[in-house]
Each structure stands twice: as C-alpha cells, then as structure tokens.
Amino acid sequence: IRELQKQLKVYADGEYVAAVQEGKFRPYVYPFFTPAGHNVLQIAPADHLHHVGICVGHEFVSRLVDGPELETSDRDGWEEYQPYAGGRTARGSDAVDFWGTESFLLGPLPRILVRSTNTDVSERGVSFDQEIEWRDAEDYLLLCERRRTTVTAGSDANIIDLVTNLEAPGYPVELRKAKDAGLLVRVADQIDVLDGGRIVNAEGRVNEEQTFGRVSAWVDYSGPVTRDAVAGISVFPIPESDGHPWHTRDYGPMWINPWQHEPMTLQPGQAYTIGARFAAHDGSCEDADV
C-alpha cells in the first residue's frame, strides 16, 4: 500500500491494482486495473463531473425533524438554496443532493467526508474500513456511513468488494425516491457502447435498450482498451442489494438503485446495507466467462 495525497494505492507483486480515494466531495475508487494492466474506470468526464469511478450517492436526502430549523424558502428551482439544506438542493425541495455535487458551480456544497480509515492486510487482500459522514453545506449531519472496501488481486480478474452501511444518526432520515441514487460505476471512455463496447446482463440482454431498468443478478460492461485488447468490469450485487433495477447507459455509467421506485425512511440508529463485488477482467464478457 502506498499513501499519496489522500490516495490509498494498492499494489500486488509490484503491479498497481486500484486506489481508494478520499476525494474532495466524496470517497471513491479510481483507478481499477485488470490483471493485464488496463484501467476500466473513468473519473469526472465532461458530461457528468460527479461520475467518479466507483462511488455512492443519493440525490434526495432529508432529515425528518420538526422544528424551526426545517423552515424552507419559497424559492423554487435547481439553482436555489434552502436555509436548512445549506447547499445545493433537489429541485427546490428541502432534500440535500449528495449525487451531483462535483458538477455544481457554486458553493458552499454538501460533502461525504471520510473521518477515519483503518487498513488491514491479509492473504485475502487489503481491506479499508472507513467511518464516513454525509454533511450538508452548513455541516448538518444527515447520514453516518460505515464502508468496507476490500481489494484482491487475481490471475483471472482483480476484485473489489465494496459494502457500505448507511445509518440515520439521532433523528430519522428519508432517502427519497430518486432516479440518481445508489452504487455507481463509470467505465473508462473507450469501453462504453458509443466507442465499441457492450453491456451484457445475466439474462444475455445487451446494451442500454435491453438492460436499462431491469433486475438482473449481474451486469458486465466491456470494450476495446487498445487496438488489440478488450477489457471490462462485472458487477455482482450482494444479496441485500439484489433485486433492484439497473441503471445502464450506453455512454458509460451503470448503477444499482434501491430507491428507483420507493423511498426509504431510516429511524435513529437504523442502517441500510448496499454493496457489490466488482471484477476487472481482460477480454469480453464471454472471454472472461462471467
């Protein structure tokens, strides 16, 4: 492990495998290499600056507490701020946007902050246990997060297991119904469908047209990384995250979204778990025998 400017870089036999980044607005994983050394992730593309490798977020998070601090402005619109939210809000509501923060042009802004990281190195791989806080732009705490990211090098694929627990602090918190929420992967530009890549799910359905909004046990995204090589990333939700629709796009992002159709209220101390295994492999989905 090498630590450099809030990056925890993982190597196996001298080969760079992945890095866990603290980030300015949220923690994320980037880069992530296949055994042959091809990076399968993209960070902050021009079309969506908030798509940072592998990360977690939610567009509509609100604290359900009665009191004067929740008085909201009657101003409306995406560009406005609310007194309680203290930062960019979701289309004029009192919910805080923890999804698109990196794309906002004005501050102060909400942030997902790493408070501590414990590292464990074993034969299985390297695990990072992080205590994380979701705070709005006025530093109100909305969610406590406990995240474990385990990086394992392999001959057929390099593996990242990311499991996170989102917990309400001393008051109930609502995670509203949202299109933009969940556990996100943004694939490397050359892998996306628009540049010759391909999305395949467990049922054999292909690309955005056939896979978007469907429930599937796994999704693979692969494409050309050089003139002669193909690489990709497979995502396998953990049992607690299985059964939710996939957001798959031909231009590069895919994510698991438990809040696509229904909101969720977490009572004080109550937690919700979301997670997945990510496999960076060489070759196509079929070549890698996903």
Where are the regions a protein language model picked out?
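Beta-strand-rich N-terminal accessory domains
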Residues: 1-71, 75, 163
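Hydrophobic beta-strand positions in extracellular immunoglobulin-like domains
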Residues: 132-134, 166, 278
